[in-house]
Amino acid sequence: MKFSAIYYGLFILQGVLSSLYAQDSLSTVKLQSVSTAIDYALKNNPDLNIYLLQQDKANSEFKTSKNYMLPEVSASASRQININLPTTILPGEIFGQPGETVAAQFGQKYTFNAGVTATKSILDWQAKTQKKIAEVNKELATLQTGAFEQKLKEQVALYYYTAIITKKALNINKSDLHVADSILLLTSQKFEKGLVDQFAVNQAEINANNIEQNINANKILLAQSVNQLQIIMGLKSAEQLVFEEEVETKLKDWKYQSELGYDKNLSVYEYQFKSSELNLKLQKTAKLPKFNTTFYWGQQQFRDDFALEFDSGSWTDYSYLFLSINVPVFTGFRNKNKIKTAQIESEIARTNLLNEQIKTEAKDELLLNEYRFSVDNMQAVYENFMLTSQNKDLSFEQYEQGIISLDQYFKTFEDYLKAESAYLNALSNTYSYYATLLSRN
């Protein structure tokens, strides 16, 4: 009995600890406002981390491109075995044989070389242009990161506002369902008393079912919005989001906006065009000469055996300075075709930039107009929503008192649902425009 009690106690303790561990393992992220959600996403979005790594890569490539201005220095050592010494034809007078030629061999079988070689590019137009391209690509990577951050802010704001508006819609739906259930109960009671027919009961039940369908649809929309937020905020599915901000049912003081901040996507197109122009210049520099210089300083040792001595008297100095110029004469039609391709790419980049500037200007103007219209529209539909809500409550009281029929009440309730839908849609549209404005300011 004593052993059983101890075992039972340990079992209970294990269950309590497991429960506590499960609670701790569920992480909760509280969102006080849309700014909180945006800041969290900017710190934890996995795709943004890739853009930052691309920035580091471009910066590293730019540093590498500047190395052409520095000399390349290398040390070398070699051992040469002359299996057959070279033969030189000399006049016989040297050997006391006038009028004849003598084949003579000079040198020793083993030669040892050790020295340092320094090579420096004096003038290389291709390397200079590649450095400029790397510099532009570094700036381009930074601008691409900024453009992605702008899009990320817009997505976070859009899903955030969709979530809190849908939560508000669910609260309204639940209130509507409560009223619909009350109508169904009241109609069923009247049916039992013979005051209404089965058709009225069916109408009341259909009305309640329709509202339940709206609730389920909004639950799906809320789950989708939360799921998208979790993804772009870098959260796991087990980590919960808590929205501490709610959409106010009363009208907010919305302000018109006359201008938008600069679209960072345009900067990306501008630098893509710059990069294409530099690439065209790079292809043209392939025709230009290259000037290089090489300096070698070393020592040699000649021997008839394989041994090697390290005293200073055993070595002789050997140094040289080498200047070279490399001029492309004929490379087939490769360079010509590369230049033509680069010209086409540059024209494409220029056209894309011009088109994007025109489209952005038009879209920005349309966005500001739509935002202004949506604010005006939201004010009107909110007033209609509040008025039809009052009419719905009055009609319910009149139906309870038998002053109006169920059909008359349903007509009022239908007007209320239409006004509710219009208000929620207007709220959603206004916040969707505001999400874009927020990302640009």
Where are these regions (language model features)?
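Amphipathic alpha-helical coiled-coil segments and their boundaries
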Residues: 37, 44, 51, 120, ...
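Short segments within alpha-helical structural elements
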Residues: 210-235, 386-441
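Membrane-embedded beta-strand positions of outer-membrane beta-barrel proteins
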Residues: 51, 73-77, 116, 269, ...
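Bacterial Sec-dependent N-terminal signal peptides
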Residues: 1-34, 424, 430-431, 435-441
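Periplasmic alpha-helical coiled-coil/stalk elements that build and connect Gram-negative outer-membrane
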Residues: 24, 32, 36, 60, ...
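Bacterial Sec-pathway N-terminal export signals of envelope proteins
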Residues: 22-74, 78, 84, 236-237, ...
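Small/polar, glycine/serine/threonine/aspartate-rich low-complexity segments that form flexible
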Residues: 24-29, 76-116, 120, 295-327
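Sec/SRP-type N-terminal targeting helices
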Residues: 49-53, 66-67, 122-149, 199, ...
